[in-house]
Amino acid sequence: GRSMHWIRIERFWEGEYPEVKMTPQQPMLCQQCGHATCEPVCPAFATVHSTAEQLNLQVYNRCVGTRYCANNCPYQVRAFNWRDYKRPEPLPNQLNPDVTVRRMGVMEKCTFCIQRIHKAQDKAKSEGREVADGEFTTACAQACPANAIVFGRVDNPESLVSQLAHKGHGVKHLEELGTLPNVTYFKGG
């Protein structure tokens, strides 16, 4: 059967035959592009860009399932929801109330846990302050046992992700396409 993944482990190869070797595997998720090729092809305007958060978002209740966005994504990170996930009572109570339940026939993707971002922004606003670095993180970063995923604002010089970015050695996948990806991959060490 089909299963839904918003992040996958991608294998890459380097070298020329017969001396080809596999490079370290990397997670591949929505790159939250500044010039996302998936946005202009959506006839229902379900794929939108949030300039405030600098994210590429999916408005699920607008999506009509044409899959044009998936065809236009060079990272192949969008997934079509082939199933209607109905659960018998009381199992629906286990669902995260902060995440929209999507219906069959819509496109899905990583949103960098926008619901967590908004929750932290609302809390900071009610307390009359800015959102602190590390105040929230994405679910994948929280669940990663190796702490290999770091989330934050690269435009905040105090943030850990900004400090990592300024050390250099970062790689952005398919940057040459002009999509302005916002995910940077760093070598471990």
Q: Which residues are covered by each model-predicted region?
A:
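Non-ligating segments of multi-cofactor redox enzymes
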Residues: 1-189
